[in-house]
UniProtKB/Swiss-Prot annotation:
A UniProt-annotated Pfam family: Adeno_E4_34
Subunit structure comment from the entry: Interacts with E1B-55k.
Organism: Canine adenovirus serotype 2 (strain Toronto A 26-61)
One cellular component term from this protein's GO annotations in UniProt: host cell nucleus
Protein name: Early E4 30 kDa protein
Transcription in keyword set: no
Domain of life, source organism: Viruses
Function: Plays a major role to prevent cellular inhibition of viral genome replication by nuclear bodies. Assembles an SCF-like E3 ubiquitin ligase complex based on the cellular proteins ELOB, ELOC, CUL5 and RBX1, in cooperation with viral E1B-55K. This viral RING-type ligase ubiquitinates cellular substrates prior to proteasomal degradation: p53/TP53, LIG4, MRE11-RAD50-NBS1 (MRN) complex, ITGA3, DAXX and BLM.
Homology family: Belongs to the adenoviridae E4 30 to 34 kDa protein family.
Major location category of this protein: host cell
Keywords tagged on the record: Early protein, Host cytoplasm, Host nucleus
Cell location: Host nucleus; Host cytoplasm
Keyword set includes ATP-binding: no
Length: 259
């Protein structure tokens, strides 16, 4: 159903959305992937599903991309005619869904401890980025980054651990992602989020054990780069201190160069 924005596909920008700063944890990766099969209603998938892509929305990078400010993001469409009525109708439907979807990212500011807990003593190769809670489902995003020589083996190992009910592994424009799904979380329920964080760490432990069966060495420590990202996000979200997104960005060249 979903495509990727590459040179081989028909891809055009249909809308631009302004996203609050609580989603700027995703801005470090230049994109927010969206699981359209989950997010769109059945009739919306029938009408517009073929025009969506894993990339979801993509950050519009400017000279002044500051973590402490709301950012603008572009929405893609993959139909064959950007001037068709179907494309224009799709634009309004998809834009409304995205605007509702990103509201669920408020937890990234409200519960900043979640990222710090999940990423504690974990390798950068499987890095928790942020969360979206939408229609009673908590989407938990991990960026995947392995050396090219072991990338394929590691991705296959991760897929063996993840069934469709638990989550999905996908390739987007700038990164590879693992998106876990939790059905018991609530933005207002602190205890459920604590339980979710513990569950997520247990899932990642299983994933890491499977990945380590491949010829790869993972350092079970919080990287200095992740500590800098956490510090920058906390200063930006809580104190309004501006940090340039480009200086902290995370882009996986394996995905970006389509390896």
């Amino acid at each position: 159903m979903e495509g990727n924005c590459t040179a081989e596909t028909t891809c055009h920008v249909t809308a631009v959305v302004r996203v609050p700063k609580y989603c700027n944890c995703f801005a470090l990766c230049y994109e927010i992937p969206i699981l359209w099969d989950d997010v769109l209603h059945r009739h919306e998938k029938l009408l517009f599903g073929g025009f969506t892509c894993n990339a979801g929305i993509e950050l519009i990078v400017t000279k002044h991309c500051c973590l402490a400010e709301a950012q603008t993001w572009r929405v893609h469409c993959h139909c064959s005619n950007s001037l068709s009525l179907q494309c224009m109708a799709s634009k309004h439907v998809v834009q409304k869904v995205i605007e509702d979807f990103i509201k669920g990212g408020a937890m990234n500011k409200k519960y900043m401890w979640y990222r710090e807990f999940v990423n504690s003593s974990r390798p950068d190769e499987i890095n928790y980025v942020g969360s979206i809670i939408f229609r009673n489902t908590h989407y938990i995003y991990f960026r995947l980054s392995f050396f090219r020589t072991v990338h394929k083996a590691c991705m296959e190992a991760i897929k063996r651990c993840i069934n469709p009910e638990l989550g999905v592994v996908l390739k987007s424009t700038y990164n590879y992602w693992l998106v876990l799904k939790c059905k018991s979380c609530s933005l207002q329920n602190y205890c459920s989020l604590k339980n979710c964080a513990v569950w997520v760490r247990s899932v990642i432990v299983r994933v890491l054990k499977e990945v380590e069966k491949t010829p790869v060495v993972l350092h079970q420590t919080t990287s200095k780069a992740e500590e800098r990202r956490q510090s920058a996000l906390r200063q930006a979200m809580m104190h309004g201190r501006c940090r340039q997104i480009q200086n902290l960005c995370l882009v996986n060249l394996n995905a970006f160069l389509h390896f």
